[in-house]
Amino acid sequence: MNEKEISEIRRRFRADKSNITHVRGCYVNEKQEIVSQFDQPLSLLPQEECENMLSVLRRTLSGTLGKNLIEMPFTTAQVVDSDEHRLLMALRDSKLTDEEAVRMFFEKVIASYRPEGTYLILLANDTYDVPYRAKDGETLEDASENIYNYVLCTVCPVKQTKPVLGYDVPENTFHNRDIDWIVSAPQLGFLFPSFTDRSADIYSAMYYCRSASESYDEFIDAVFNREAPMPAEEQKTTFGTILGDSLNDACSLDVVQTVHSRLCGMIEEHKASKDPEPLTITGRTMKTMLTACGVPGEKAEKFEEACAEQFGADAALSPRNLVETKKFEIKTPEVQIRVDPEYSEWIETRYIDGAPYILIPAGAGVQVNGVPIAITRPDVEYEEEE
């Protein structure tokens, strides 16, 4: 799925667009025990509650593609004959009316997801009459292209509110508000099947994870029967480690600055092009980039080999997972420097009197702890004002 396809399905989760007739739910306590289950018809809910329910579900299709939204492919063998794929198909094809399939799915999630507190599992089914899209991009609402039938799973923490004072308007007084339990933003979930090329793709699901640093290995293994992808934050850390270890003494400030600048440039160009397909690079692409930066060929080769070992051969990585586009950071054991990436080229390293230094040009407006300071030349005497 690309960004346009995700946005198209996300827009379905509105009261005037959705064909969702009911939502299945399972409330689980901190002991992994089912507290309650429900099958809630949306038509019986007040409009505000219906919109809140759809809003919670919609968030499962939010975030950045490749970071929060990750494609989970199924092998041909899984699609032909596997318990995990058969269960997902049963949920979809029955429109969540297969009680045994719903029960088995809830049990799978509970056995594989163990947060500290209570949580809510939501299942929704929607049937989308996909409108025809002409070659010029215009959508013809009255001309259907195909029917897309899918299920969306959302897992949300349920948290207790804190005691607070509330204002009672009729009595014109303040009282303690009762402690309550509220449904928080989704922690993880998935869409099945994927909406690839604007049609159902039973060979793929779109997995959602709110945190870019979390990896719910057991959940992914239970639901998709596959290895969990490396979280975005771990990709960034691993990429930096590979860069430093493989280049060794060739990993200079200039090289890191250039790599950061070029990756950020690729991200900006992709954003400006409005290409819906995700931007990716491979270890081979990075090897070419490093060679262009002046890195010796054998070290660039070592980098490519390390990428294949850590990420997989010919793995397609999102540059957004590898660099911070809004900051450029330098750390020593004692000092931390953060610079707007636009001005990172101002920083340089130099040996002075045999000691290594990090140099930053100081213009006007220098402050220390909020106090503006003056930087004087050592060969110029300070003159007192009369």
Predicted regions and their residues:
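Long, hydrophobic alpha/beta structural blocks
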Residues: 14-326
